[in-house]
């Protein structure tokens, strides 16, 4: 409500998260424009270009990680015949590993490991969700190289998120720990579970 007082948590970490969101949005829009010529994405990228440039000046390491990972992924995905799924998965992990490190400190290695494992999980989960559309559009999908279908990915995805939660439980988190647990132990599975349930009903 506009007349009620609100408690907002704003600090250097929330500002950092907002900056990384801008950087990721910029590269995602430019990638969509390059791959599928989505003109609206190009316009949006242009509208946030100045903000992105400011972010890149503040966080060159992170923005370099995003651009290099996208370029590497593009090379992997375009070399369809020789594309190795594990390389694409690791590439996504490497990108997120750098974004999870705001600054170098005692916990940097743990945060890099957390980001790396989470990045791999997200990439494989997205691939599972996009499998049917990717085949229809003849897009690269690592599941094809793995000879797996989405419904056969549960064990691999469980192992990936298990690696994530193992590192998560060792981090010195105090605030909103229960919310993060809810996401990592349940929320990340919501769309996948719904998709599998719909498929079972359809073929059941």
Identify what each model region corresponds to.
Residues 1-20, 49-91, 109-113, 134-172, ...:
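Divalent-cation-assisted or electrostatically stabilized phosphate/pyrophosphate-binding catalytic cores
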Residues 166-203:
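C-terminal domain/tail detector
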Residues 94-114:
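Extended serine/threonine-enriched, polar tracts that run as long, contiguous segments within proteins
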Residues 41-46, 112, 178-182:
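Short, charged, amphipathic alpha-helical segments
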Residues 14-34, 40, 44-58, 95-96:
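Amphipathic alpha-helical protein-interaction segments
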Residues 32-40, 102-109, 171-175:
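Inter-helical turn/loop segments and adjacent helix faces that build the functional surface
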Residues 26, 97, 119-122, 161, ...:
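Structural signal for well-ordered, non-membrane alpha-helices
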């Amino acid at each position: 409500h506009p007349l009620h007082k609100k408690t907002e948590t704003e600090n250097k970490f929330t500002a950092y998260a907002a900056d990384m969101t801008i950087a990721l949005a910029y590269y995602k829009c430019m990638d969509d424009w390059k791959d599928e010529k989505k003109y609206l994405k190009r316009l949006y990228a242009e509208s946030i270009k100045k903000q992105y440039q400011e972010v890149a000046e503040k966080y060159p390491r992170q923005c370099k990680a995003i651009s290099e990972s996208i370029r590497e992924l593009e090379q992997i995905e375009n070399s369809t015949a020789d594309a190795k799924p594990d390389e694409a998965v690791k590439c996504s992990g490497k990108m997120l590993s750098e974004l999870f490190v705001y600054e170098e400190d005692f916990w940097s290695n743990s945060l890099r490991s957390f980001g790396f494992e989470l990045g791999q999980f997200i990439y494989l989960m997205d691939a599972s969700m996009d499998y049917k559309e990717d085949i229809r559009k003849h897009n690269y999908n690592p599941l094809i190289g793995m000879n797996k279908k989405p419904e056969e990915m549960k064990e691999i995805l469980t192992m990936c998120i298990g690696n994530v939660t193992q590192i998560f439980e060792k981090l010195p988190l105090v605030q909103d720990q229960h919310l993060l647990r809810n996401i990592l132990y349940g929320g990340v599975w919501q769309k996948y579970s719904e998709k599998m349930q719909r498929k079972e009903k359809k073929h059941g």
